[in-house]
Amino acid sequence: MIPGEVIPKAGEIELNAGAPQVVLEVSNTGDRPIQVGSHYHFYETNGALSFDREKARGMRLDIAAGTAVRFEPGQAREVRLVPLSGARKVFGFQQKIMGDL
């Protein structure tokens, strides 16, 4: 082994295996691009994103950690969400929850 070397497991890795999923149509009604990171509480994203927010409560994007999805002005796309895991408490973001989900 070489210091810092990464040896990936053979085969494919399934993200969020077995997690319940919600698919939502999301559109950017604003005039600026909006980028949402992998672990951002989707319910609390920028108000210019139009979607069913109640279905997104307690959810995050079903994408690899450290990545993001970008919504260009006027763009609509489907996104797949999975539940936030762990203690199921949300603090910060836009301060709309500040506690238990």
Swiss-Prot record:
Biochemical pathway: Nitrogen metabolism; urea degradation; CO(2) and NH(3) from urea (urease route): step 1/1
GO cellular component, one term: urease complex
Organism superkingdom: Bacteria
Subunit structure as annotated in this protein's UniProt entry: Heterotrimer of UreA (gamma), UreB (beta) and UreC (alpha) subunits. Three heterotrimers associate to form the active enzyme.
Biological source species: Chelativorans sp. (strain BNC1)
Places the protein is found: Cytoplasm
Keyword Transferase part of the UniProt annotation: no
GO biological process: urea catabolic process
Key words, A-Z: Cytoplasm, Hydrolase
Name of this protein: Urease subunit beta
